[in-house]
């Protein structure tokens, strides 16, 4: 059973901010391509939050939602917010190979609620080997170190975090320089990022070896956030090698404050604020934040919130979710 039965995907503040940031990044595609011709592939579950956002804001009219749980098929069909969404039943490893990603530009977001596994690597291979230049691929996964405290598959009586992480990633993929490293939360994030990007670049290298058209994958996203559990999101654009610089400039991708092209993460941290606090802060934003953390606004510096909380909000106020209870 997926996490949809435990968490309302529409009510996770940090996830909501992530979706809006990604949407803003994707909007830059319109400077090089017609976004309405793209296909969006995701894991919509029963909420379809990303589908609603991307259809309304990007004008994407062809959308595919992959659902592996047959028990919620009727519920997913009922909850589809738009007729342009096609529900494909099955695991991502069986559905993705049958999508014609080689025939059209695509945006693919594999938003897993599980930890890293062979499925993740299989999907990376399928998508990156097929998708066309100027397409976007991103994946999110559970990056909580609690996963490392699960019993080993080969011996259910043993709990060994070092062996567990090798088991999850696969011995052949596990980088040697991480083998003797204690798996702290930070090291685990670095390991996951390294393995994901290594797999993507390996597929790109194989693809270039078999085709005259040479491509590259340019990472633009490396988010972490916490809505109950720590999640990691890594992604970027596939370009023709000769187009990459020009297209990144036209799309203004690198000017976004949350753009990340390395293992350095962007932490999405929504402070919990009252409606009155939000309204007051908004009336004084945007503002300059100095190197010492001070804000270039007397009102904000005297506001009854910590400087850290105000700076967190100032960094993402344009994406901050608004929740309102209504009686229908």
What are these language model-derived features?
Residues 2, 6-100, 251, 268-272, ...:
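SAM cofactor-binding core of SAM-dependent methyltransferases
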Residues 3-8, 97, 115-328:
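Class I S-adenosyl-L-methionine
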Residues 16, 102-106, 190, 230:
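A generic "functional-site adjacency" signal
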Residues 35-38, 103, 134, 231:
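Sequence-level motif detector for i,i+2 pairs with an aromatic at +2
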Residues 35-38, 111, 206-210:
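N-terminal start-of-chain detector that recognizes signal peptides
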Residues 47, 64-154:
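Long alpha-helical, hydrophobic tracts
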